[in-house]
């Protein structure tokens, strides 16, 4: 009977133990970029992407409420395991919306080299 009781207590205690979760490379890289964002502010997105070394799987751009013809932010989504992570970029200069929105809709927001290349020369104002 004692063995049964000890075994039951042991099983319940295992459920309460929190395992240390190791962060994967994608999470580490994204956190690194956010922590060192000063390195990328005022520079083309190409600098950030070169350091990141991970291709985005989805790109979603946003417009300010008062002007839907331009883009002022873009979210670059990355996938690792079953989780999605993203980096948001606020652009120094507004980007013309027409061409980018057409690409995003045609590809259902999946990242393409064509779209990434458009953003590479755009200057980063902030990273979050």
Model regions and ranges:
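Bacterial Sec-dependent N-terminal signal peptides
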Residues: 1-24
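Residues within mature, well-folded domains
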Residues: 21-128
